[in-house]
Amino acid sequence: MAHPVHVGLKEATSPFMEELIAFHDHTLMIIFLISSLVLYIISMMLTTKLTHTSTMNAQEIEIIWTILPAIILIMIALPSLRILYMTDEFNKPYLTLKAIGHQWYWSYEYSDYVDLAFDSYIMPTYFLEPGEFRLLEVDNRTTLPMEADIRMLISSQDVLHSWAVPSXGVKADAIPGRLNQAMLASMRPGLFYGQCSEICGSNHCFMPIVLEFSYFXDFETWASYLYIVSL
């Protein structure tokens, strides 16, 4: 969970987000080294009194500044491709959850359960309990089992939306008439917050997402309770 004067990415709860954080650090280190080298060369050019006005070509230097950037790009591309293919791999998900964006709320459908669907609206400020977060709480939290691969299907009923939960490393566009999919998982129980990340109208900032990851037994109990209530 983010907090005031928080700097950096949110704490990861999924293997995907852990990989993204590692890739971020890897790329940032490369950028830092390149920036340091460029600043050093600029400072040397501004302070040195040596000149080479007679130099017409330098084949060795040209080879170096052609090969070195190619190596750096490969060092960035390989881990990026690995994460890209990992996030697109769906190997027997435990359940499928469909998220549909509306102006301005989310609706969820559990495809593996009978009649398990609900709408999730932002919680009005005057209904908040002590310790709850303004503009982030919802009336119906999305409960999911931890340590399970969950396939997300994301779509929209009206305009473009984007379903995003930073701690889980998930961000997928919700496009009318189209289904996008993403893999979701959590290695620990808890509450994880997200928001619509695509400007979708005047109440765009009032479309929070709350995921509640729990143990398998608690999730099945919750699903059974909702089914009984819906009868």
UniProtKB/Swiss-Prot annotation:
Q: Which Gene3D superfamilies match?
A: 1.10.287.90, Cupredoxins - blue copper proteins
Organism of derivation: Brachyteles hypoxanthus (Northern muriqui)
The annotated topology with respect to the bilayer is:
Multi-pass membrane protein
- How does the annotation summarize its subunit structure? Component of the cytochrome c oxidase (complex IV, CIV), a multisubunit enzyme composed of 14 subunits. The complex is composed of a catalytic core of 3 subunits MT-CO1, MT-CO2 and MT-CO3, encoded in the mitochondrial DNA, and 11 supernumerary subunits COX4I, COX5A, COX5B, COX6A, COX6B, COX6C, COX7A, COX7B, COX7C, COX8 and NDUFA4, which are encoded in the nuclear genome.
Going by the entry's taxonomy, the superkingdom of the source organism is recorded as Eukaryota
List of residues binding Cu cation A1: H161, C196, C200, M207
Which positions bind Cu cation A2? C196, E198, C200, H204
One GO MF annotation is: cytochrome-c oxidase activity
Q: Lineage of the native species? A: Eukaryota, Metazoa, Chordata, Craniata, Vertebrata
Transmembrane spans: 15-45, 60-87
Q: Name one GO biological process term.
A: ATP synthesis coupled electron transport
Residues reported to bind Mg(2+) = E198
Name the GO cellular-component terms: mitochondrial inner membrane; respiratory chain complex IV
* Protein name (record): Cytochrome c oxidase subunit 2
Which EC number applies? 7.1.1.9
Its biological purpose:
Component of the cytochrome c oxidase, the last enzyme in the mitochondrial electron transport chain which drives oxidative phosphorylation. The respiratory chain contains 3 multisubunit complexes succinate dehydrogenase (complex II, CII), ubiquinol-cytochrome c oxidoreductase (cytochrome b-c1 complex, complex III, CIII) and cytochrome c oxidase (complex IV, CIV), that cooperate to transfer electrons derived from NADH and succinate to molecular oxygen, creating an electrochemical gradient over the inner membrane that drives transmembrane transport and the ATP synthase.
Cellular compartment(s): Mitochondrion inner membrane
Q: Which segments sit on the Mitochondrial matrix face?
A: 46-59
What catalytic reaction does the record list?
Answer: 4 Fe(II)-[cytochrome c] + O2 + 8 H(+)(in) = 4 Fe(III)-[cytochrome c] + 2 H2O + 4 H(+)(out)
Which keywords are on file for this protein?
Copper, Electron transport, Magnesium, Membrane, Metal-binding, Mitochondrion, Mitochondrion inner membrane, Respiratory chain, Translocase, Transmembrane, Transmembrane helix, Transport
